[in-house]
């Protein structure tokens, strides 16, 4: 009996030792981690970013790098499933939805906007196309609605009385009311409200099952808090057409799926055609060519050119448009996005099969995002 107990305890000890030895083994380090850490760690420190999710695509494989916390109060860490507000990166999904409406025959980009909204008949939008709304070239619609436009009735009245400052198509004026109206009317052309159409048709078609316009109760635990300049926890306050212009909440894993769809395609033929349509250039401003949602550059692209295309001058001022540049076979697509508490950046190069998603729960300068992403992509391109 004593011998049997000794054998039993010996076996248990052996198993325990094996378990401890296994637990002590270091998990394999992603070979891309030093590359990503070198750019991201200084960023977190300099801009006091509480948490960041970085997702990288290389050779068809996803790599995830997570830093800090999603919620300072609970201490919940960031993961590739953490939901972040992506601000204007939402415009790329809105543009894809609009392109899907085109592919389905519900509308055309050269349709006059008032064709899809009887309440716009007799206004300036009898002469402004859906494509001009989608590409911020309607003639000078502002970055934001005036503060007093806080209801659907006031929004309609605002559009009806608005008059272009420039000839439609002649100037780019980056604008939430412009692409917001495009998304709203595109959904109307498909006979559905925008949010259900996005959540029930487009996002599932892209494999983005953890992405929302309105975060449901069961996903709220994954929703990060953003942090203001004063370090107060905040989330987006929706305004008019916020869903269409800056309303998406998603994870780095889901947003990288969208990048992968833009690089390698999707099975749904109509959706694939829609994605391709968003990549087509409509005009150029400097080195940047404006597509539907996406902004593109001939690749390789210098850091300076990327910074210029995402500068305050391009975002806040009206810029004359020129014929779209010939980009050749290699193109980098990108988009920045922010809300008061979050900062996002997405960039990818289809010909190289590389892409990056950077989601942070602080709104920090575009310049810092672009410098970090440019450095990482340069290493990925090898």
Swiss-Prot record:
Any single GO BP term: response to antibiotic
Conditions for induction: May confer resistance to poorer substrates by high level expression.
InterPro entries, A to Z: Bact_CellWall_Synth/Modif, Beta-lactam-related, Beta-lactam/transpept-like, Beta-lactam_class-C_AS
Classification via Gene3D superfamilies: DD-peptidase/beta-lactamase superfamily (3.40.710.10)
Function text: Class C beta-lactamase which confers resistance to penicillins and cephalosporins. Has benzylpenicillin- and cefalotin-hydrolyzing activities. Has weak cefuroxime, cefotaxime, cefoxitin, imipenem and oxacillin-hydrolyzing activities.
E.C. number: 3.5.2.6
Family matches, as PANTHER family: BETA-LACTAMASE-RELATED, D-ALANYL-D-ALANINE-CARBOXYPEPTIDASE/ENDOPEPTIDASE AMPH
GO cellular component, one term: outer membrane-bounded periplasmic space
Residues reported to bind a beta-lactam: 88, 144, 174, 176, 363
Miscellaneous information on this protein: Described as a cephamycinase, but cephamycin substrates such as cefoxitin are chemically very similar to cephalosporins, and sometimes classified as a type of cephalosporin. Cefoxitin is a poor substrate, hydrolyzed only weakly in vitro. Nevertheless, CMY-1 may confer resistance to poorer substrates by high level expression. The class C beta-lactamase family has a specific amino-acid numbering system known as SANC, for structural alignment-based numbering of class C beta-lactamases, or else the simpler name structural position. A multiple sequence alignment was used to derive a consensus sequence and then the consensus was numbered taking into account insertions and deletions. This allows use of identical numbers, e.g. for active site residues, despite differences in protein length.
Activity control: Inhibited by the beta-lactamase-blocking agent sulbactam.
GO function term, MF aspect, one: beta-lactamase activity
Coiled coil start-end: none
Organism: Klebsiella pneumoniae
Family: Belongs to the class-C beta-lactamase family.
UniProt-recorded name of the protein: Beta-lactamase CMY-1
Active site feature: 88 (acyl-ester intermediate)
One Pfam family linked to the record: Beta-lactamase
Keywords: Antibiotic resistance, Hydrolase, Plasmid, Signal
Reactions accelerated catalytically: a beta-lactam + H2O = a substituted beta-amino acid
Signal peptide (residue range): 1-23
């Amino acid at each position: 009996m004593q011998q049997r107990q000794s054998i039993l305890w010996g076996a248990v000890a052996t198993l325990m030792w094996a378990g401890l030895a296994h637990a002590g083994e270091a998990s394999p380090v992603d070979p891309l981690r030093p590359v990503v850490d070198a750019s991201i760690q200084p960023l977190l420190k300099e801009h006091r970013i509480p948490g960041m999710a970085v997702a990288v695509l290389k050779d068809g494989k996803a790599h995830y790098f997570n830093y800090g916390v999603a919620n300072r109060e609970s201490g919940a860490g960031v993961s590739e499933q953490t939901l972040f507000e992506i601000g204007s990166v939402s415009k790329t999904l809105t543009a894809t939805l609009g392109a899907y409406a085109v592919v389905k025959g519900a509308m055309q980009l050269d349709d006059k906007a008032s064709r899809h909204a009887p309440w716009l008949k007799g206004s300036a939008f009898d002469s402004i196309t859906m494509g001009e709304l989608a590409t911020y070239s309607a003639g000078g619609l502002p970055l934001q609605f005036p503060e007093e436009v806080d209801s659907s009735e006031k929004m309609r009245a605002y559009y009806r009385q608005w008059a272009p400052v420039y000839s439609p198509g002649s100037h780019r004026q980056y604008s939430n009311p412009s692409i917001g109206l495009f998304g709203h009317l595109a959904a109307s052309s498909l006979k559905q409200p925008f949010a259900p159409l996005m959540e029930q048709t487009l996002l599932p078609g892209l494999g983005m099952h953890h992405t929302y316009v309105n975060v449901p109760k069961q996903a709220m635990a994954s929703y990060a808090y953003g942090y203001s300049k004063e370090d107060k926890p905040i989330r987006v306050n929706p305004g008019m057409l916020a869903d269409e212009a800056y309303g998406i909440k998603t994870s780095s894993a889901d947003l990288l799926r969208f990048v992968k769809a833009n690089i390698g395609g999707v099975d749904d033929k109509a959706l694939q055609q829609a994605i391709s349509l968003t990549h087509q250039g409509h005009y150029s401003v400097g080195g940047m060519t404006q597509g539907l949602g996406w902004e593109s550059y001939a690749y390789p692209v210098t850091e300076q050119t990327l910074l210029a295309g995402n500068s305050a001058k391009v975002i806040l001022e009206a810029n004359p448009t020129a014929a779209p540049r010939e980009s050749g076979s290699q193109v980098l697509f990108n988009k920045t996005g922010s809300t008061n508490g979050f900062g996002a950046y997405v960039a990818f190069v289809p010909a190289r099969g590389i892409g990056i998603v950077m989601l942070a729960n602080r709104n920090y300068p575009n310049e810092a995002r672009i410098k970090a992403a440019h450095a990482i992509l340069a290493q990925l391109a090898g």
